């Protein structure tokens, strides 16, 4: 209690996500799950085509898999439309989304991912070092005196999903916007 009283002025009060950002987060995570399932069905269909000989069972499995993949594609499209509607309905989300997508290589999914995981860029108080560490973009080495040195590497607790999305965005920007 004494510690809390002494450091009360330094305390950062918790602020829950806004309603629209919480909904955006749920939609984004649901979309990721659907895309993962779609990918797994596509891989399984490809494996079945290679391993099974022509038979009525193979035909049935292939048709069923194709139907499931098409339904999952429709679901992803519905989610994408809902995400776009949600962003347009909130003024703050629209403003941030417009700014983020103005960066070459950053698309809708990259922008939504960044907005969701950084609480619409308010989570780190605009500190670039903290943001780079969280994204997994800032490698750090260990040095101690003259004998202990390690190569710089990214911490294992960095957000790998954001790092992967930003890497893909950078590759796309280099490829299409030299």
Residue ranges with predicted function:
Residues 1-99:
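Long, charge-rich intrinsically disordered scaffolds of nucleic-acid metabolism proteins
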Residues 102, 108, 112-178:
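Phosphate-backbone recognition surface of nucleic-acid-processing proteins
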